[in-house]
């Protein structure tokens, strides 16, 4: 499947949040996903919100996630991406740190 010159193995992908630290994207691609999205990645490392940060709402059969984008930061993510061993579409979900200046 082709979209804007990007060649996807198929249309089924794995969205951001599963591999927040960019440590398993090659292995996940080997499972057959058409694309992998890592992150959320912020410019600087951050630990995320204090625990508990995931809450179950039994009455609604749902979860609330307030993880706070815990990740090792952009520099570490760039190193891990540089070691990528396979060719596939890799997306990166990005956000700013709470201390970042500029637009919200």
List each model region and its residues:
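Active-site-flanking structural segment that lines cofactor/substrate pockets
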Residues: 1-23
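Active-site-proximal loop/turn and secondary-structure-junction residues that shape catalytic pockets
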Residues: 20, 40-42, 94-98
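A gly/proline- and charged-residue-enriched helix-loop-helix capping module
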Residues: 39-89
């Amino acid at each position: 499947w082709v979209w804007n010159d990007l060649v996807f193995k198929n249309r089924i992908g794995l969205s951001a949040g599963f591999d927040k630290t960019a440590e398993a994207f090659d292995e996940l691609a080997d499972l057959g996903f058409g694309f992998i999205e890592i992150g959320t990645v912020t410019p600087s490392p951050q630990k995320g919100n204090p625990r508990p940060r995931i809450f179950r709402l039994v009455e609604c059969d749902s979860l609330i996630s307030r993880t706070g984008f815990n990740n090792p930061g952009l520099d570490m993510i760039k190193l891990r991406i540089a070691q990528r061993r396979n060719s596939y579409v890799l997306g990166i979900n990005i956000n700013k740190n709470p201390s970042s200046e500029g637009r919200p």
